[in-house]
Amino acid sequence: MQTQAPYQEVVAEYARIAGRYDRKWSFYIEATMQETIARLPLGEEDRLLDVGCGTGALLYRLATVHPPTRLVGVDPVPAMLKIARRKLPSDIALHEGWAEQLPFADAQFDLVVSCSMFHYVARPLDALIEMRRVLRPGGQLVLTDWCGDYLMCRLFERYQRLRAHAHARIYRTHDCARMLKESGYAAVQIETYKINWLWGLMTARGTHVQA
């Protein structure tokens, strides 16, 4: 797949760190996985899509703790997907793609989850609409990311803007809620929490209700 801007910078940055990503961010990955999984309304035989699956850490954990769940991942970085393919069972399908243009037909998934990906998305409304498109009616989006309500996250974002050109922006809870509603989600809920002194996160949930 030909990489489209602005994901060229994301691909370049994560291709460079893919081999050490899991080690470098081990605490953050573990903490965000636990918080996200705790908020996933998983049912028997649900089909789940992980958008921005990276090296497959969340999919690997879900395959362990919820084995009946049918799992699919998508990510724009081939180097990260290569690592994911080595660690994941062969029945977990992995695809190259980006949030604004998912390579799936309509209404394919019961759950769409995205963990620590949204701050890279240049067109957030397009991405939210696209994730809703692949949800079946009644399906849910569960999105975990940095939260701009926290001062330390806002300061860290300023630092990231100086050193990481792939970074787009983080959002406050009211911005996230507004975008979810504008994108057609119902029953929008957002929880905020901290995993340490630096990282303040939010997990947003919205339901795809058929018009």
Predicted regions and their residues:
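C-terminal lobe and adjacent flexible extensions of AdoMet/dcAdoMet transferase-like proteins
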Residues: 204-211
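A short SAM/SAH-binding and catalytic strip from SAM-dependent methyltransferases
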Residues: 111-123
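Conserved class I S-adenosyl-L-methionine
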Residues: 1-42, 57-61, 80-83, 156, ...
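C-terminal alpha-helical "lid/dimerization" subdomain adjacent to the S-adenosyl-L-methionine
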Residues: 4-8, 25, 142-201
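A short glycine-rich, Lys/Arg-flanked "PGG" loop and its adjoining helix->strand segment in the class I
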Residues: 125-137
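Class I SAM-dependent methyltransferase SAM/SAH-binding core
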Residues: 49-51, 55-101
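Short glycine-centered segments of the SAM/dcSAM-binding site in methyltransferase folds
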Residues: 47, 138-140
